[in-house]
Amino acid sequence: TFDTGGISIKPAPDMEKMKYDMCGAAAVIGAMQAIARLKPSVAVMGVIPTVENMPGGKAQRPGDIVKSLSGKTIEILNTDAEGRLILADAITYAKQLGATHLVDAATLTGAVVVALGHHFTGVFTNNDEFLARWNEAAKNSGEKMWHMPVNDQYREQLKTVYADIGNIGGRDGGACTAAAFLREFVEDTPWIHLDIAGTAWLDDSKPWMPKGPTAIPIASFVRLAQDWK
C-alpha cells in the first residue's frame, strides 16, 4: 500500500512512485501463485504484512515505543522506517508457524539504491549455506544479486536508551542497518533478506527489461522452491 513516510514525511518529488512500495508483497503473491501451480516437493508458506503509512491524528510519532510480536520493544526514531516494523512481526509470525528457513523481499531502503543502483538486488544473510542455495537459484533465474554485510557492528548503530532497539541506525550503511534490524527478530533461523528497492521497478527501459515493475525476485523464489532438496 502507499507510503508517504508518515509524520517523518517524504519529499514531494517522486512520492507518486511510492505506489511501488508494495513490490515485495506483490512478489510473494506472484511467487506463491506459481509455486502452488508447480507443486514442488517442499512446503512453502507466504506471509504478507501490509500497512498504509499516512500522516494524521492517529499516526505513529517519532519517540513512540512499540512492542513487537516477539516481545521486543522498538523506539520509533523515524516513521518512514515503517516497513521493517511490519517485516519484523511477519518474520516472528512465520517462525511461529514453523518456518525452518526464511526469505523476505522488500523495497526497504533508498540506501541500497545508492550502493548498487538499479542493476543488483542487495542480499543479506545469517547463513552461508543458505546463501549458496539462494545464489544458485538466482543465477539459474537470471536475476542479479549482490551479497551485502550484516555484521554485528551494524547492530551497534541501532542501540537506544529507551527500548531494546531503534528503528533506524543513522545515515551510514542504511541498507545494512535495516538488515541488522530484521536479523534481531530472525535470530538463528537461516535467513535471506532481499532489498529490492533498486530492482523492483525501472523508470526507464533497459535492454533486458521494459520500464515499470520488473517482478524481481519472483523467478528466484520459484527456482529455490523447485530445486529444494
Residue ranges, per PLM feature:
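A generic structural signal for tightly packed, nonpolar segments enriched in small/aliphatic residues
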Residues: 1-229
